Amino acid sequence: MDSKPYRYISKAINLDLYNELVSEIKPKRELMTVTYSDAKIPERRETAWQTETDISAEYSGKTMDPVPFTPTVHMLKKKIEEIIGVEFDSALIFHYIDGKDSMGYHYDTIGVGRGNHIAGVTFGSSRCLGVRNNETNEKEFFNLGNGDIFYMFDDCQKKYKHAILESKEENPGPRIAITFRQMGPNLSQKN
């Protein structure tokens, strides 16, 4: 059996932190540059960037300046490092307010290349994460619920794309996802 460079860990963190995280982080919806154009459109989700480094997060024509970890995000970083066995120094945070907030199939570039480890944890309502193989277009789907972790590693960003799909539920409720990443040069990892 061919092992895949991603892993789903159900109910890894048994805490209800959605309201606390949104209040503490204060994510915001910004304008993004449309690919192959100078047009700016509102992002389909709210975002925030927290890090122990002095590195900004940049994608789609926007730059997020480095902001230190808030207490709850720092506590979650430590818990995820224990579970995964990899150190992280940054977190790109996504707030999906309703079922229309989504993200199409893509591969990550922020924090990829240095360690290729991204561990995302979800709080709040469930959303469907799709993972698509770049060669075969085969898809796998995961219903990410409160406290679930989705961990991508090795060559995942080269071989697969992933998406948070638009919800078909009438009122799915909000969700926040904290994706821990490696930006700095001095982190350890089990491999």
Curated annotation (Swiss-Prot):
Q: Quote the SUPFAM superfamilies the UniProt record gives.
A: Clavaminate synthase-like
Q: Which InterPro entries match?
A: AlkB-like, AlkB-like_sf, ALKBH3, Oxoglu/Fe-dep_dioxygenase_dom
| Stored Pfam families | 2OG-FeII_Oxy_2 (PF13532)
- Outline the extent of the Fe2OG dioxygenase domain: 87-184
Molecular functions (GO terms): dioxygenase activity
Annotated GO biological processes are: DNA alkylation repair
Domain of life, per lineage: Viruses
What name is this protein filed under?
A: Uncharacterized protein R406
Source organism of the structure: Acanthamoeba polyphaga mimivirus (APMV)
